[in-house]
Amino acid sequence: MYPLVISKITKNTTKSVLISFEVPEAEKERFRFEAGQYLTLETKINEKLVRRSYSICSSIDEGLQVGIKEVPEGVFSTYANRSLLKNDLMMVAPPD
């Protein structure tokens, strides 16, 4: 897992966000991706470490992005939609 800064959060609908990550130059190769790959994100929510995987939904030209839809009682998806902010730090595993 590597700490990546959230460079942008776009509210697509009332229940979904597009999260863009800033990948440091030194990690560009590690975070290269192909269509169909996903990212595993990890953060602490209410003092518990929570990890979820989301499909990458961008082209290489758009940078590293995932879309997250809020689901009922979804701990991570609710947190992502309601609490994450631009410039927050998120632990992210390289694409898989």
Stretches found by the model and what they are:
Residues 1-88, 93:
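Ferredoxin-reductase
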